[in-house]
């Protein structure tokens, strides 16, 4: 074998090894997450008990704001958990015993509120029909409710039934749209990134928890 051919094969083999590694490069965990880790673990234990996954809530906060406590979205969502003002006012009433005078800009309160809201949404996700509803799908539906409102999701699950697909399978429901294409694309991407990419990344970085979607 000539040295030129050997060199070409070596370059190709190195590319085949390195390319997948680059494609699956780890998520960069913001340094700011360390400032809030104790609070995340504290509220997850309070809201979920031993079955909670701090890594999941951390992943959601990462997606929402990148852990920036002064984050404000173009549409007006506020703080580390990105609550809209109307949602924040509703939560101040709904979770008054737990939150007191709720301020969405206060990261201590907002992290607690995010966990409470996730629990509230998850408890409202119910199976439709006779097919099983997995924990992964329940969480995906709850996350979609957090991001885009549970009303839209219920309409889309209804469209899924009308389309003779499984309204309890989050990936099948993704194919059906009741809202505009832009909001729908954002809404289906939201749980995918949190549950399939970010939660495993936080677990790999040492945060406690178990990935709900595998």
Name every feature range the model reports, one short phrase each.
Residues 1-9:
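N-terminal Sec-pathway targeting helices
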Residues 4, 21-38, 50, 89-116, ...:
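Non-catalytic cell-wall polysaccharide-engagement segments
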Residues 8-17:
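Bacterial N-terminal signal peptides
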Residues 44-54:
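Short, charged helix-capping/linker segments at alpha-helix termini
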Residues 52-56, 62, 75-78, 138-139:
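Extracytoplasmic
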Residues 59, 82, 142-144:
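Soluble periplasmic/extracytoplasmic beta-strand elements of cell-envelope proteins
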Residues 62-87, 149, 194:
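Cell-wall polysaccharide-cleaving catalytic domain and substrate-binding groove, primarily
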């Amino acid at each position: 074998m000539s040295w030129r051919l050997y060199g070409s094969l070596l370059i190709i083999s190195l590319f085949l090894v390195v390319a997948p590694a680059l494609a699956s490069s780890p998520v960069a965990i913001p340094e700011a997450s360390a400032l809030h880790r104790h609070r995340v673990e504290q509220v997850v234990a309070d809201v979920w008990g031993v079955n909670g996954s701090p890594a999941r809530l951390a992943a959601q906060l990462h997606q929402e704001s990148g852990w920036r406590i002064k984050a404000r979205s173009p549409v007006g969502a506020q703080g580390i958990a990105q609550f809209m003002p109307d949602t924040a006012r509703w939560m101040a009433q709904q979770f008054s015993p737990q939150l007191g005078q709720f301020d969405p800009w206060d990261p201590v309160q907002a992290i607690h509120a995010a966990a409470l809201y996730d629990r509230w949404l998850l408890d409202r996700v119910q199976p439709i029909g006779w097919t099983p509803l997995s924990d992964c799908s329940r969480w995906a539906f709850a996350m979609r409710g957090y991001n885009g409102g549970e009303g839209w999701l219920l309409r889309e699950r209804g469209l899924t039934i009308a389309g003779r697909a499984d309204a309890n399978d989050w990936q099948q429901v993704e194919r059906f749209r009741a809202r505009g294409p832009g909001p729908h694309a954002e809404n289906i991407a939201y749980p995918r990134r949190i549950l399939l990419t970010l939660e495993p990344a936080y677990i790999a970085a040492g945060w406690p928890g178990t990935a709900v979607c595998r």
